[in-house]
């Protein structure tokens, strides 16, 4: 039973997550298998949906979906998505390349990302997906250090969300506020067509989305003009920086998924396996 704390209106349940955590990705899958939902809403812009879902179909091969800022339309450092090739290293995306100063927004298609796990599960169960974040010509991130996600093994998601709630502060700048209002408006629109909606969003944003949803004066800000999204292969040397978990741990999660084995405690057990594997080499 989902706690009232995580309900936004009569038809929306929110699952606040810490991005890049295998433990939160596991919690997303558990919740979606336990409760029937007729719609999944995620905090990503609609322009990312097609490329992201195509990339998810190719997991466990990781990739990245990129949207260049409008300020950098003249940049030529990326190839188009139709040149995506596993053997073509010339078109690999290397975020550690210091020779380029490109402004981009990107989504790492990483199975240990809670949002990716939610979309992947919804695709497998044929649940409609809606990307409800506002389109931005240059995304302004909002982040901070959060408590260790391993706490989920000792407490419920509801208790975790309640424990961090007093320390969650609103973002700065007009864009963050506009994004919150836009997502709240989209949830209102979805509530007309769906009765059991699951919203997967950052633990930093959900209290403000809930407040905006219940604001009678809520208005929907207009999206900004954008560039088309593109999808790229990732160079092996940068997986450590792209993936939320260590590449070795991510591989263990994918192997457990394929073998239908228990992966609840892989965040800790995987480190043990990593040390054993390193000792044997």
PLM features: what roles do these ranges have?
Residues 1-281:
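Compositional signal for N-terminal targeting/processing segments
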């Amino acid at each position: 039973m989902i706690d009232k704390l995580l309900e936004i209106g009569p038809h929306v349940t929110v699952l606040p997550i810490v991005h890049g955590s295998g433990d939160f990705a596991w919690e997303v899958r558990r919740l979606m298998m336990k409760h029937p939902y007729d719609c999944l809403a995620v905090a990503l812009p609609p322009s990312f949906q097609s490329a992201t879902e195509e990339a998810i179909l190719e997991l466990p091969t990781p990739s990245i979906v990129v949207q260049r800022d409008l300020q950098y339309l003249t940049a030529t450092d990326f190839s188009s998505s139709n040149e995506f090739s596993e053997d073509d290293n010339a078109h690999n995306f290397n975020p550690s390349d210091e020779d380029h100063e490109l402004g981009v927004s990107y989504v790492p298609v990483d199975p240990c990302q809670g949002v990716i796990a939610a979309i992947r599960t919804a695709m497998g169960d044929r649940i409609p997906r809606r990307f409800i974040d506002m389109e931005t010509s240059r995304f302004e991130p909002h982040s901070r250090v959060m408590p260790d996600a391993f706490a989920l093994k000792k407490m419920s998601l509801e208790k975790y969300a309640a424990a961090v709630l007093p320390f969650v502060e609103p973002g700065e700048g007009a864009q963050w506020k506009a994004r919150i209002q836009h997502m709240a408006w989209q949830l209102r629109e979805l509530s007309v067509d769906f009765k059991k909606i699951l919203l997967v969003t950052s633990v930093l944003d959900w209290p403000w989305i809930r407040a905006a949803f219940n604001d009678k004066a809520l208005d929907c800000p207009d999206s900004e003009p954008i560039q088309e999204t593109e999808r790229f292969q990732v160079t092996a040397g940068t997986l450590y920086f792209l993936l939320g978990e260590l590449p070795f741990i991510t591989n263990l999660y994918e192997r457990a998924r394929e073998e239908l084995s228990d992966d609840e405690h892989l965040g800790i057990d995987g480190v043990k396996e990593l040390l054993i594997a390193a000792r044997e080499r």
